[in-house]
Amino acid sequence: MQKKVLSFDLTGTLATFSFCDAIYFEGLPRLYAARHGVPFEEARAYLKSQYDTLGEEIPEWYDIKYWFHRFGLGDRWGELLREYVPHIEYYPEVPRILERCSREYELLLITNASREFMEIETAPIRGYFTQTISCVSDFGEVKKTSEFYGKVCRSLGRRPEEITHVGDHWQFDFVAPRGHGLRAFYLDRTGERLGEHIVHNLVELESQLI
């Protein structure tokens, strides 16, 4: 009998924001400061203003190659990602939860991060997943809409009711998948929200799946 699918968001769900923040607010500003001869803090403020100008709803926002080109930093983006590998950090319960859940489910990863980012950030846990999906790299989309989850179902050859998704964004990881018929859980690590299908860590998720 085919296992059902358990789908995870990445940043804020499995991984903290440490790696992403280090790349965008330390690594890129450091390279920009060195290339253009400006103080680091000035470079960081300028780059942040440029990130805000483009906005997170544009696919290029998630593309490290785009920012290297835009800021005149060459093409050695892979070196920067590898340099900041020590900043990759998972929430404490993640390894054991993935190990246990992988016995009962096919694990899927769905993220807004570009594939270049995702491949580096998930390397230590990649073996738990049967498939990984980057909204930006694989579908050219930045929002996980109900229609997006429909595309995911079709690409997997699965019915919506065969997939459970969990993530930390109310709209993209909870409302949208439920809108297409998936079972979904909202992960609120702040503990501020309470209710059915709301969990505060992945240990609580595991108990809900039983």
Question: What do the predicted segments below correspond to?
Answer:
Residues Q2-R96, E116-F117:
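N-terminal helical cap/lid subdomain that shapes the substrate entry/recognition surface
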